[in-house]
């Protein structure tokens, strides 16, 4: 009896040994087929629907803060070409500047679903301002402000003189009175700024810091518009590209991230672009814009897409649906340049 049990046990062990290589082989075959299917799917061109689902609108709300002794004492929207501070204010809300561009959802790795909320857009970022340059800007702005106060005082003298000698309260009188009231308020604002500048010293080492808040707008398959907060995780000064990622590091539902392969797409011939109408024109830009597919022609990585049909950041595809790059001005930023940006991602 014992011998029979021993023989049965031995036979079972031999059978299991035969099955183990088969199981490994089957697992290997399934894994290999899965990899082949995934690579083939990755190389599969985008459909028109997927092209539209790969884009979103990026809204950048930016402003500058003047920080002195660790405290923010002044806000302004931008720095003009003549170094003037644009819309300086004691309140942040009155100097926020909003710019729009097209963003493209992307995978970090070509053959792996690795988007995790990553988006690439084109947006110029100004250089950082060192402390010495900051003090120079402050001194120049102080001089401009004092000059503006003198101009406003002269204007108000003339306006008040007109109001005194023309005391008939007709339509013309009311218009001038309202204008004088606006100038009086502007003078009061400039005087408050002058008092602030008078309290500042170079020894206080004031700083000018740029702040930016990014929001991505995208549409669900049913057309409903959604928005999600983004953070900057990388940028390229040369290409003026910015790599963004959702705060939660998750890919929104309904979007179709693009994979950026290792070989650049074609540089000449007919192509397709996905653009938001009006987004490339400051007066028409809005987060409510809808995207469309527009034909274009490439010549040495340059396109002929009008800005009113597709602004910076619009993705360009071959007529077969393969991703080529994104627009910046009348140029196309290539896949290799976009891959370089993904390599610069800052790790949390």
State each model region's role:
Residues 55-204, 313-317, 323-331:
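Catalytic histidine site
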Residues 77-86, 289-299, 348:
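Short, positively charged
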Residues 11-32:
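N-terminal Sec-pathway targeting helices
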Residues 43, 98, 223-225, 231, ...:
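Flexible, gly/ser-rich surface segments that form the specificity/activation loops bordering the active-site cleft
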Residues 35-48:
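Membrane-interface motif at the C-terminal end of an N-terminal transmembrane signal
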Residues 1-13:
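N-terminal intrinsically disordered, acidic low-complexity segments at the extreme N-terminus
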Residues 50-58, 96-101, 106-109, 114, ...:
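Extracytoplasmic
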Residues 110-123, 178, 182-268:
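Conserved active-site neighborhood of the chymotrypsin/trypsin-like protease fold
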